[in-house]
UniProtKB/Swiss-Prot annotation:
One of its GO terms (cellular component) is ribosome. The keyword Ribosomal protein applies. This is Small ribosomal subunit protein bS21. Gene3D superfamilies: Ribosomal protein S8 (1.20.5.1150). InterPro entries: Ribosomal_bS21, Ribosomal_bS21_CS, Ribosomal_bS21_sf. Keywords: Ribonucleoprotein, Ribosomal protein.
Amino acid sequence: MAKTVVKKNESLDDALRRFKRTVSKSGTLAEYRKREFYEKPSVRRKLKSEAARKRKKF
């Protein structure tokens, strides 16, 4: 979990910007979006295969 301590004489906007950066770097939101709904293993395999095919195409 991302943790940000507000430094002395630091504005709230700067602290929020720093927090958002740490969250995005840690991948917390991406992981949340990925696990928001249950995905059957067969569907997961299908999506993975399609993504690989798409990458190979380009």
